[in-house]
């Protein structure tokens, strides 16, 4: 068996982004047009062989239960990190969240990262937790992992007696929260030692990331926390050397799923300086008539959103995603690193489609290191 390449510490990957099907249709189209849970497991194997740091799986209640898919990936790999990206903190009792992390660590080694968020009721992810409840959930899970037995009645609910009789004997998993990094969430991160990092969503531009990073650093300064103790991860859609049509499905159509909901769109307006009028026209597209504010993502597969996506300026997509040649993509990823991101997570495309990109990214790092030494 050939040796695995060195891990690229600042590059991870999402697997089977968005909606999936239980099996491929007779004519699946592009590689990313339709994906299955089984392909997600293989994507994880490919990610390890290519040297990605870890893979993230975004939970969906239909066919993307994270414990199943991440467990399958961990069983077929030896060092690859596996992470939820994200699960709604309110969709599971904290004991179950703690059990998920402890079990994966015990079964496959200390490779799990728990990514949690406040919730998205439209996706069936439970209620929309307050920031206080989210912070308490993270703290509760860390306390359970440490072996504590305790009572809890607070913002996260009246949970009664908590604690695991058998725990993982080693360092606990890290916890990151999925949010935009605006002042309120930045304060939650800074004031909650149990939170180790933030996962910023796809479609933020380098400008948007730099603003989120500034909010987090300022909040840490006010809270007396070392800003360096908060790892900043960002999802970046990547489409290296792919056809224009597949690129539009990966980037433009997926952007609709983030920008159509007003509650998310406003955050992009603030961080990216994007025109609210453009996003309002997107929400008023005839294809969305009658969905009454429900997420377009729940009514249409991404390939069905290419039409509405034409309302989005191409420059917005070029600013927020890595497209074109491999070197074009490398330059774009570097912009996100320069904006303050510690780790980039490729999104929308498969690890295999990013094989040349991770190789070029590794070469860039090695060349920079050689210059520094010389």
Regions found by a protein language model. Give the residues of each.
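Conserved, mostly hydrophobic/aromatic
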Residues: 51, 73, 104, 141, ...
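Active-site mouth loops of central-metabolism enzymes
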Residues: 11-38, 85-94, 169-181, 238-241, ...
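Glycine-enriched alpha-helix->loop->beta-strand junction motifs that scaffold or abut catalytic
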Residues: 51, 76-79, 108-110, 191-199, ...
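Hydrophobic faces of well-ordered beta-strands that scaffold small-molecule active sites
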Residues: 9-16, 55-57, 81-85, 112-116, ...
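Alpha-helix-loop-beta-strand connector modules within alpha/beta enzyme cores
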Residues: 64-87, 140, 144, 221-223, ...
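Short, acidic/polar
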Residues: 33-47, 97-100, 179-190, 250-251, ...
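An alpha-helical appendage that flanks or caps ligand/catalytic pockets
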Residues: 2-7, 127-166, 207-335, 371-374
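N-terminal beta1-alpha1-beta2 module of alpha/beta enzyme domains
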Residues: 1-81, 172-173, 371-374
């Amino acid at each position: 068996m050939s040796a695995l390449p060195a891990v690229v510490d600042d590059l991870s990957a999402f697997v089977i982004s968005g909606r999936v099907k239980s099996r491929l249709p007779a004519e699946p189209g592009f590689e990313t047009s339709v994906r299955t849970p089984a392909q997600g497991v293989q994507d994880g194997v490919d990610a390890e062989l290519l040297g990605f740091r870890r893979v993230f799986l975004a939970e969906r209640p239909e066919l993307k239960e994270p414990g199943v898919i991440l467990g399958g990936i961990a069983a077929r790999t030896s060092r690859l990190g596996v992470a939820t990206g994200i699960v709604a903190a309110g969709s599971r009792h904290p004991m179950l969240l703690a059990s998920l992390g402890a079990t994966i660590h015990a079964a496959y080694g200390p490779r799990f990262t728990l990514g949690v968020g406040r919730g998205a009721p439209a996706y069936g992810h439970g209620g929309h937790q307050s920031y206080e409840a989210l912070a308490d959930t993270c703290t509760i899970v860390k306390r359970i992992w440490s072996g504590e037995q305790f009572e809890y009645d607070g913002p996260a609910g009246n949970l009664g007696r908590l604690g695991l009789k058998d725990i993982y004997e080693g360092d606990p998993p890290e916890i990151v929260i999925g949010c935009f990094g605006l002042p309120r969430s930045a304060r939650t991160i800074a004031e909650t030692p149990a939170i180790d990092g933030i996962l910023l969503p796809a479609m933020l531009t380098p400008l948007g990331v730099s603003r989120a990073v500034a909010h987090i650093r300022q909040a840490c300064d006010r809270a007396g926390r070392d800003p360096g103790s908060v790892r900043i991860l960002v999802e970046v859609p990547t489409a290296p050397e792919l056809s224009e049509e597949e690129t539009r499905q990966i980037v433009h159509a997926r952007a609709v799923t983030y920008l159509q909901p007003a509650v998310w769109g406003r955050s992009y307006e603030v961080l990216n300086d994007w025109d609210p009028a453009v996003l309002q026209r997107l929400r008023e597209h005839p294809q969305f008539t009658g969905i009454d504010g429900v997420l377009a993502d729940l009514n249409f597969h991404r390939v069905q959103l290419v039409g509405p996506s034409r309302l989005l300026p191409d420059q917005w997509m070029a600013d927020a995603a890595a497209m074109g040649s491999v070197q074009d993509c490398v330059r774009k990823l570097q912009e996100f690193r320069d904006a303050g991101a510690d780790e980039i997570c490729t999104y929308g495309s498969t690890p295999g489609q990013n094989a040349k990109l991770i190789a070029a990214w590794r070469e860039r790092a090695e060349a920079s290191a050689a210059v520094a030494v010389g």
